[in-house]
Amino acid sequence: MILREISDRVYYMPNTEETDRPTLGYIRGDFFSVMVDTGNSPGHLKLFYEGLKERGLPKPEFAVITHWHWDHTFAMKAFEGTTIASRMTNEILDNVSSWKWTEKDMKMRLISGEDIEFCDIHIKKEYENPADIEVVTADIVFENELSINLGGVHCNLKLVGGPHCEDSTIVHIPEEKVLFVGDADCIDFYLKQ
């Protein structure tokens, strides 16, 4: 099975280190379903959709973005629903959406420190042609907290920051006692902290 079950309402797809595909989450409510992060590419998102089909689960109407990093956001354009992010994340995505994905531009971002070698290497592994990358902003933006009633279960979003990046958002599902943290508890690869 592509997706692993935490409960009859919460599932996840494990990460894949080779191409830096992060864990993706899924919360099924009686009215709506939510995805946690959209993944690092349309191919990653497609595999997630295949996992939903395999389990007989509906595609999510919403996707919550935990932070701006490429591996969590570069499939937003391909997501077949409404995306939600904190204002801070959205502002960063707005900046990244102007980036060009030529070899020269990618190299210049490494030199300037705007991007890091770890991401550059994994982007090139995930994308046959990085010029296909299209970064977009979220459809819905929240300030610090947002609660979504999915029907029988809630998703409580909270901007918490953390050691990984200042725009980290957590997703708490209190009825299921589940917390998706994205990478909020990881080190900052950009500042190597």
Where do the PLM segments sit?
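Conserved beta-strand hairpin/beta-sheet module of binuclear metal-dependent hydrolase folds
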Residues: 3-50, 169-183
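Active-site environment of divalent metal-dependent phosphoester hydrolases
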Residues: 41-43, 68-74, 90-93, 164-167, ...
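Active-site-proximal loop/helix segments of hydrolase catalytic cores
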Residues: 154-193
